[in-house]
Amino acid sequence: HKAFGVATQDEFFEKIKMKKKIYIIGFMGTGKSYWGKVWAKNHQMPFMDLDSLIEEKEKGKVLDIFEQKGEEFFREVEADCLRSTLPFDNSIIACGGGAPCSHNNMEWMNENGLTILLEATPAEVFENIKKETRSRPLLKDKNEGEVIFFIEKLMNERKSFYDQAQIKMP
């Protein structure tokens, strides 16, 4: 990520490994899965994607789970899958954008690992996700103006949770 200088990366990850697990959080389109995979590869750490764990458990895509069973059901499964990462020390876990915001997940992640927030502006998020809004459950039926407005609104709603991250990376 922009804040990651090569000179400090090894030292940074040695500190992080003392915390056992790394939970990468942030809004959709901030690069959580991308950077999680990069950091995991560079530091020989296992990588897990929370949405993939959910899809595996429910045998379906996040979008379909959202549509067929609703957000409340999805958030319950998400919380269960998040807690299933507890035994996996020295792992990097990329979380869905809304994961920190329900079921005391943020508090749980802070107690059981290190939370890193990847930050981005609404414009940066839109640039990163504009080609894939149809696959994003919260955005799929919105036009460009509605998507940007929705991103700003949802970012504001999630801010109090994201602000609890132990490390923030712009």
Predicted regions span which residues?
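Walker A/P-loop
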Residues: 33
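ATP-binding Walker
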Residues: 30
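NTP-dependent small-molecule kinase module
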Residues: 12-17, 42, 156-170
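A glycine- and Lys/Arg-enriched "phosphate-lid" helix/loop adjacent to the NTP-binding pocket
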Residues: 112-157
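P-loop (Walker A) phosphate-binding loop of NTP-binding proteins
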Residues: 27
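ATP-dependent small-molecule kinase phosphotransfer cores
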Residues: 50-110, 135-137
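Hydrophobic anchor at the beta1->P-loop junction of P-loop NTPases
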Residues: 24
